[in-house]
Amino acid sequence: MGAMNELINATAVKRLVAILDRPLPTVVASIDSLDPLSLRERADLVSEALLVDLPVSYDAVATAFRDALRDPAFSGWIIWPIGETVTSAALRDGSPEAFDDALALMASLTSRLTSEFPIRRLLQADVDRALGIVQSWTSSEDEHVRRLASEGTRHYLPWAIRVPALLERPEATIPILDALYRDESDYVRRSVANHLNDLARVHPELVVSVASKWMSQPDPHTAQLVRHALRSLVKKGFPPALQLLGYHPAEVTVSALTLDTQSVTLPGSLGFSFTVTNDGPESATLAIDYAVHYVKSNGTLAPKVFKLASAVLAPGATQTFTKRHAFRQMTTRVHYAGSHALEVQVNGVQFGSVPFEVVLEPKLSFTHDPRNGP
């Protein structure tokens, strides 16, 4: 994450000071504290410094940033703390006028850098008032603003604080998605799909109901959007989601599941192959997935399902599938040594499993030989 943290660095802060063109001593001093901080912490640090240096009045803060928008250089990740400052100033003011204007300013800022993070505290403060304004963004001519309407109200937006009222009322954002699922911009539609996929974590029936409605009133992109939105439910084998996408229960046999090695040393990979046979009397549309059962820190196994392929098999037909799966340490996954397993999944149904070992790369150690001197 080191390179990511540098998205808000000394150069960016100095450029911000130059653009705002006013004495900002606390902001300048904050540069010395950036190094050990994460990107989120850097955004908070700069925002807190801006709140010290700028006037207390919300109107003065908003005017300073609207003036800065005239400069094309007022862009990039430094906009994150700007948005947080706007939110803090509006909540400090406490008036409905400041609240509404803060959301309007977020819409102006979002083409420079997404405002999806700073609007979360406004949603926390008054979700109904905020959603009323956000709903109006769905008809904006700016695709960045339309995307913000969906992305900023996601229930499990990565990096963002949770909005309890949205978690308690999952249906509250559906009108926003209904207005955007046929948007002309792929950028917006991807956000809609991810938003619906978020909801699928806890409310799969609601998600399938919404997706079914969209499929009954589609445009040329709706089928692809729905497939992306239901991806997690397909991996979980949720029957209504599978059937909506045309993956009905099928009579199939999975055989000859073969691994190219019984032991993977990190970093490394595992190659495998298997065959699927349609034993039924009709053609079968199949979602072919596989699950790796990873060893957790406590020694238990936890499955992670991966997409492999879609296929249509005629009655009696057989098809062979091959895949190579990489194993390497990542910030999002820590590997542990031990007995893992690989399993094939077809239309949400699991077919056996094959064990294999994962071995961590040995750390080099050196033993001093006194004969070699000190």
How does the language model describe each region?
Residues 349-366:
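Short beta-strand elements
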Residues 258-265:
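Short beta-strand segments of immunoglobulin-like
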